[in-house]
């Protein structure tokens, strides 16, 4: 990192002083945090936005996973406001019913994205990190994409009650599956392929 680079850290609790790091005590889901970040960033744009935040876990897995992915979505909102074009975004997520929806949203903002499981993360843990590279910096962003109630609305609420079926859910496939033998040959919709063995 070049000398003189600005590093900002945000947490709900005070962070012990780190040389050359400015820390803020805020909740990234609030307007107050966004205002404080804007004040600190002035007109600059970030090279990297990294979120390792996590909710208090231990109640129910569905609730924990929802809250973790909600934090990731809020971190993505911060990235869209402060990341430079071509920048990098890294966030912790939990594999859950919201995972594919979250990945779709991230894909809309980055040329490349991938899920990574660091060696330091326990293999039985559901946590992974998503890395988005080459931020597209779109001129217009539909704010609903960054709202958990819209991005995750077709999945489950945090108590686990079914609110609707996601297109990624197995029951959706069974529910909407057509019961027929296939498409007519003249439609060019055959799913078979002939190959020499």
Where are these regions (language model features)?
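S-adenosyl-L-methionine
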Residues: 3-57
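Histidine/cysteine- and/or acidic
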Residues: 102, 111-126, 133
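SAM/dcSAM-binding transferase cores
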Residues: 123-197
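Short coil/turn segments at secondary-structure boundaries
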Residues: 20-23, 36-38, 61-65, 94, ...
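Intrinsic disorder
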Residues: 17, 27-31, 40, 44, ...
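Short, ordered loop/turn segments at secondary-structure junctions
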Residues: 12-13, 28, 53-54, 88, ...
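Aromatic/acidic cage segments in peptide-binding pockets
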Residues: 3-5, 26-27, 65, 69, ...
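Conserved Class I SAM-dependent methyltransferase catalytic core
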Residues: 61, 65-115
């Amino acid at each position: 990192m070049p000398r003189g680079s600005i590093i900002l850290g945000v947490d709900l609790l005070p962070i012990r002083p780190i040389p050359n790091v400015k820390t803020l005590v805020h909740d990234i889901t609030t307007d107050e945090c966004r205002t404080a970040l804007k004040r600190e960033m002035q007109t600059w744009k970030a090279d990297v936005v990294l979120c390792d935040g996590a909710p208090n876990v231990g109640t129910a897995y569905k609730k924990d996973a929802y809250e973790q992915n909600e934090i990731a979505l809020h971190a993505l909102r911060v990235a869209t406001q402060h990341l430079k074009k071509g920048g990098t975004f890294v966030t912790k997520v939990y594999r859950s019913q919201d995972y594919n929806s979250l990945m779709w949203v991230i894909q809309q903002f980055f040329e490349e994205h991938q899920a990574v499981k660091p060696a330091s993360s326990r293999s039985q843990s559901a946590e992974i990190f998503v890395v988005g590279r080459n931020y597209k910096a779109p001129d217009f962003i539909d704010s609903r994409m960054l709202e958990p109630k819209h991005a995750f609305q077709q999945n489950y609420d945090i108590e686990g009650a079914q609110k609707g079926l996601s297109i990624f859910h197995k029951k959706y496939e069974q529910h909407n599956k057509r019961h027929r033998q296939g498409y007519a040959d003249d439609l060019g919709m055959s799913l078979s392929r002939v190959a020499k063995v």
